UniProtKB/Swiss-Prot annotation:
This is ATP synthase gamma chain. Belongs to the ATPase gamma chain family. It comes from the Bacteria. The keyword Transport applies. F-type ATPases have 2 components, CF(1) - the catalytic core - and CF(0) - the membrane proton channel. CF(1) has five subunits: alpha(3), beta(3), gamma(1), delta(1), epsilon(1). CF(0) has three main subunits: a, b and c. The gene is atpG. Its main location: membrane. NCBIfam families: ATPsyn_F1gamma, PRK05621.1-2. It holds the Pfam family ATP-synt. Produces ATP from ADP in the presence of a proton gradient across the membrane. The gamma chain is believed to be important in regulating ATPase activity and the flow of protons through the CF(0) complex.
Length: 316
């Protein structure tokens, strides 16, 4: 049986580790709430912008405006924009996005398309840079805010927009983690460019609020505020032509879509980290309990051995 001192030292180490993981869980829980609040605050603007675009598009002719961001061409080159985090300790969050990116890359390559990568987050950059002979990396972004801002989205949008308008790529797809709840986050693929003005509002959008119940963190599911927005008046008069307005508003809508993908990813990363740290805390607690039992058994065996030696010595 292991030495008593070794077991005791390991118990202390496990308990200290549990304190760290518990602290990280609480920090992630607080940040998840902030990330979700940011998403909620941005939704009214996103909904209004989508409604304005729908209104403008309904006034356009069937020939469609000469909007560069709406143009579709023969697909030759496709750019995949993968969103991961800069740090680990968040379960399968980063690895799931990397796997989905590899799958999509293989699918498009198999169909004969040239595929480029734009990578967001140190984890994706490190992984694909180590395999640079297999993948073409067009741009990388790191050091984004933990709670994404419009500046983060603008810097990325500017890069991909320049690629698309210069016809260096014919389509841009973003691969990010859609936040569902604290224990379920799914990697999704969404076409970012060319934009489609049809059906731009997401009807299945839901809100998940982080609350406490019976002293435990839980999630309440609610209905998104989009339905609460009053409809746009039908008699709005625009000074510019629908084509001019569309060309001016589509870049803003593109940036808003990018910001939403970053926000969803940030919330998913924090939720995954909170879940991972919660599991680590539970495992540390169970391990400490097992080690304590081993320590007590070893201590009891040592005491029994000493008694037997004393009794044996007195008999002799």
């Amino acid at each position: 049986m292991a030495n008593l001192k070794d077991i005791r030292d390991r118990i202390v180490s496990v308990k200290n580790t549990r304190k760290i993981t518990e602290a990280m869980r609480l920090v992630a829980a607080a940040k998840v709430r902030r990330a979700q609040e940011q998403v909620l605050r941005s939704r009214p603007f996103a909904d209004r912008l989508a409604r304005v675009l729908e209104n403008i598009q309904s006034r356009m002719s069937f020939e469609m405006a000469d909007a560069p961001l709406l143009k579709t061409s023969d697909l030759k080159t496709i750019t995949l924009l993968a969103v991961t985090g800069d740090r680990g300790l968040c379960g399968g969050y980063n690895s799931n996005i990397i796997k989905r990116t590899e799958q999509r890359y293989a699918e498009l390559n198999g169909q004969g398309y040239k595929v480029d990568l734009v990578l967001i987050g140190r984890k994706a950059i490190t992984y694909f840079s180590n395999r640079s002979s297999q993948y073409t990396i067009r741009a990388t972004f790191t050091g984004l805010e933990q709670v994404p801002t419009s500046d983060d989205a603008e810097s990325i949008t500017t890069e991909v927009l320049a690629e698309f308008l210069s016809q260096s790529t014919d389509r841009i797809e973003v691969i990010y983690t859609k936040f569902i709840n604290l224990v379920s986050c799914n990697p999704v693929v969404q076409t970012l460019l060319p934009l489609d003005p049809q059906g731009i509002a997401e009807a299945d959008d839901e809100i998940f609020r982080l609350t406490t119940k019976d002293s435990r963190l839980t999630v309440e599911k609610g209905v998104g505020p989009a339905n609460e927005q009053p409809p746009l008046p039908s008699d709005i008069i625009f000074e510019q032509s629908p084509e001019q307005l569309l060309n001016a508003l589509l870049p803003l809508y593109l940036q808003n879509q990018m910001l939403r993908a970053l926000q969803e990813s940030a919330a998913s990363e924090l939720a995954s980290r909170m879940t991972a740290m919660n599991n680590a805390s539970d495992n540390a607690k169970a391990l400490a309990k097992t080690l304590t039992l081993d320590y007590n058994k070893a201590r009891q065996a040592a005491i029994t051995q000493e008694i037997l030696e004393v009794v044996g010595g007195s008999c002799s």
